[in-house]
Swiss-Prot record:
GO terms for molecular function: magnesium ion binding; phosphoglucosamine mutase activity; phosphomannomutase activity. The gene is glmM. This is Phosphoglucosamine mutase. It comes from Chromobacterium violaceum (strain ATCC 12472 / DSM 30191 / JCM 1249 / CCUG 213 / NBRC 12614 / NCIMB 9131 / NCTC 9757 / MK). SUPFAM superfamilies: Phosphoglucomutase, C-terminal domain (SSF55957), Phosphoglucomutase, first 3 domains (SSF53738). GO terms for cellular component: cytosol. Keywords: Isomerase, Magnesium, Metal-binding, Phosphoprotein. Mg(2+) binds at S104, D243, D245, D247. Pfam families: PGM_PMM_I, PGM_PMM_II, PGM_PMM_III, PGM_PMM_IV. PANTHER family: PHOSPHOGLUCOMUTASE (ALPHA-D-GLUCOSE-1,6-BISPHOSPHATE-DEPENDENT) (PTHR42946:SF1), PHOSPHOHEXOSE MUTASE (PTHR42946). InterPro entries: A-D-PHexomutase_a/b/a-I, A-D-PHexomutase_a/b/a-I/II/III, A-D-PHexomutase_a/b/a-II, A-D-PHexomutase_a/b/a-III, A-D-PHexomutase_C, A-D-PHexomutase_C_sf, A-D-PHexomutase_CS, Alpha-D-phosphohexomutase_SF. The keyword Transcription does not apply.
Length: 445
């Protein structure tokens, strides 16, 4: 059954336009609350609500609070807190659910709502569909004796800071390291600097002055140029860039080189494999560079590919019983440390790995160079693009065997097929990408 409101990461959109309106968000809170009450009729459920630093967070927080309490659910409010912080506190406080008001790496004009289930895990499909079904029912406020209560909780940030620090090995310290930390003017602005400072690092802070409008604005994991310049200017050892809600990580070394999620996952996996502590293998996505897969195989580390989206990486990790995975975008999962992707915790795992291996980022990542990728977006007229591309696709896969691969991905929002070819030779990637694209264009003419 397809979802009507939920995407791969909750409900998201431009503020003031459906579904990110106070009216709909209140009803969303009510629907989710009714589902929680139906699942736990012996006691009154409690949910945790956190948000990033967008100006619209105040409005949407109030709407959610109204919806949940109308359904008879108690609400705890944390104020600004990273998405993984809400996941952690949902588990630590043994709550029925956690809710985050954030649009992650998007600009301030957007916002979204995503849920964590009991235990700090993302909602499964069945629960999302229950909430969607409840959204189609009329909203009926509980009698006054059955309304929920709401209050702000103290110490949420401090508890999460201590949790982050606990994932860094006790025998190690960040003393002697100079770090530039870019918090994207987002939810980690009052968290990440304290974590690194309390572990001993000398800090330079950027993107730590949110005003409601500057989240992800030329700062953060999606705009590493600012971090590169700051690392070079301050002669720092490393730069750490997080995104607006704190679940992505990009790093920069002392020479100003940028390291994406794939490279950082490789660093973590290599260090764990060297110590015999890597459980199973590594999960990436269909877009993970093949060169990384081959490098892991040389280390004897199995590699699996999930669909694009950290939700699907997480599902495959659980299915295989593995712990490490993620995406080039900087979503990194270390399931022995946290139930969800966490930029701060991932950066601590990278820094610990470097200390344990006694190598630099550049030295470890020299194990592999990303294969060149050619991406062509092909617009079609609704034709059978799979049939049209079958012959050149088969030829390409035969020609690239062991040297590259082809990924064809239809857009979910427009009549476009994304043709991606990667190979150890740029000309080879270009040739086959153009051949497949031309075959689709021919039947669409």
């Amino acid at each position: 059954m397809s979802r009507k409101y939920f995407g791969t990461d909750g409900v998201r959109g431009e503020v003031g336009k459906f579904p990110i309106t106070p009216e709909f968000v209140m009803k969303l809170g009510y629907a989710a609350g009714r589902v929680l009450v139906n699942h736990d009729q012996d006691s009154r459920p409690t949910v945790l609500i956190g948000k990033d630093t967008r100006i619209s967070g105040y409005m949407l927080e109030a709407a959610l609070q109204a919806g949940f309490t109308a359904a008879g659910v108690n609400v705890l409010l944390t104020g600004p807190l990273p998405t993984p912080g809400i996941a952690y506190l949902t588990r630590a406080l043994r709550l029925e659910a956690g809710v985050v008001i954030s649009a992650s790496h998007n600009p301030f004009q957007d916002n979204g709502i995503k849920f964590f289930a009991e235990g700090g895990n993302k909602l499964d499909d069945a629960l999302e569909l229950e909430i969607e079904a409840m959204l189609d029912q009329p909203m009926a406020t509980n009698p006054s004796l059955e309304l929920g209560r709401a209050r702000r909780i103290d110490g949420a940030a401090e508890r999460y800071i201590e949790f982050c620090k606990s994932t860094f090995p006790n025998e190690l310290s960040l003393k002697g390291l100079k770090l530039v930390v870019d918090c994207a003017n987002g939810a980690t602005y009052h968290i990440a600097p304290k974590v690194f400072h309390e572990l001993g690092a000398e800090l330079v802070e950027i993107g730590c002055e949110p005003n409601g409008y500057n989240i992800n604005d030329k700062v953060g994991a999606t705009y590493p140029k600012t971090l590169q310049m700051a690392v070079l200017e301050h002669q720092a050892d490393f730069g750490i860039a997080l995104d607006g809600d704190g679940d992505r990580l990009i790093m920069v070394d002392a020479a100003g080189r940028v390291y994406d999620g794939d490279q950082l996952i490789y660093v973590i996996a290599k260090a764990r494999a060297a110590r015999g502590e890597l459980k199973g293998g590594v999960v990436g996505t269909v877009m993970t560079n093949m060169a990384m897969e081959l490098a892991l195989q040389k280390q004897g580390v199995p590699f699996g590919r999930a669909k694009v989206g950290d939700r699907y990486v997480l599902e495959m990790l659980h299915a295989d019983g593995w712990q490490v995975g993620g995406e080039a975008s900087g979503h990194i999962l270390c399931l022995d440390k946290h139930s969800t992707g966490d930029g701060i915790i991932s950066s601590l795992q990278v820094l610990a790995s470097l200390k344990q291996l006694g190598l630099s980022l550049a030295e470890i990542c020299a194990d592999w160079r990303p294969f060149p990728q050619t991406l062509i977006n092909v617009r079609h007229n609704g034709c059978d693009w799979k049939a049209a591309s079958a012959a050149p696709l088969a030829e390409a896969e035969a020609a690239l065997q062991g040297r590259g691969r082809v990924v064809l991905r239809p857009s979910g929002t427009e009549p476009v097929v994304r043709v991606m070819v990667e190979a150890d030779d740029k000309a080879l990637a270009d040739t086959w990408a153009k051949a497949i694209a031309a075959a689709i264009e021919k039947v669409s003419a």
